[in-house]
A protein has these predicted regions:
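Non-catalytic surface loops within mature trypsin-like serine protease
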Residues: 27, 59, 93, 139-141
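Local beta-strand/beta-hairpin segments that build beta-sheet-rich folds
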Residues: 123-124
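Surface-exposed, glycine-biased beta-strand/turn segments
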Residues: 1-86, 118-119, 166-200
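Acidic, glycine-anchored pre-beta loop/turn
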Residues: 109-117
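Short peripheral tails and domain-boundary helices/loops at the edges of structured domains
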Residues: 139-183
């Protein structure tokens, strides 16, 4: 029997046959990367802006957790970021279990510290502000914007320059269907610690 995988829709059966056998839908999914789903799948007008310490996006709508995780920080006041919210969560399953993800800037958290979440859990509402959002790998402490700098090998703070740790997260997002950032092909700065997904 022939099988086809089209954008997460898996069909089984004899495709194109003239007999009465119809393709059978086995599963429908958004996931492309192992164990993770597109956390920005319900963001309206999603615009990838750049890679820096993380990945910046414009748009508005609901933001989900990348995968199974536990919320480690959730505040509606800026944790050193412009625009508002600060959320971090530690992945508990999948190939990057143990790593922490941050979501910052124009977001309002709808989760609480200690809450267990999955890729089906809305963790924040992204609002159409002047800053958009930034998301990426966080240090374990994950308390403020400054916590990103040492790990990313930051280039004097925010700027239009991609970092290796930012590209690592951007490639993970691409693997689950998020559009690529426009500056991803520029020379990356900083270091990528050994325990983070390598850049492809």
């Amino acid at each position: 029997m022939a099988q086809a995988d089209l954008l997460g829709l898996r069909l089984a059966g004899t495709l194109g046959a003239r007999d009465s056998q119809q393709p059978e839908v086995i599963s429908v999914g958004v996931a492309v990367g192992p164990g993770y789903q597109n956390p920005l799948r319900d963001v309206s007008g999603l615009v990838p802006e750049r890679v820096d310490m993380g990945v910046d996006f414009g748009g508005s709508g609901q933001v989900y957790a990348l995968g199974d995780a536990v919320i480690t920080n959730a505040t509606g006041t800026s944790g050193g970021w412009p625009g508002g919210g600060w959320i971090t969560y530690k992945l508990t399953d999948g190939p990057d279990a143990g790593l922490t993800v941050y979501l910052a800037e124009d977001v309002s958290p709808v989760v609480q510290v200690g809450q267990h979440v999955s890729s089906a859990t809305v963790i924040a509402n992204m609002f159409a502000g002047s800053d958009g959002i930034e998301t990426g790998w966080a240090q374990q402490s994950g308390l403020s914007a400054e916590s990103q700098l040492a790990e990313a090998g930051g280039v004097g703070g925010n700027g239009p320059f991609p970092t290796r740790i930012g590209l690592s997260f951007e490639e993970l997002l691409q693997s689950v269907g998020v559009p690529a950032a426009p500056n991803r092909d520029q020379y990356p700065y900083g270091v990528l610690p050994a325990n983070y997904p390598p850049i492809g």
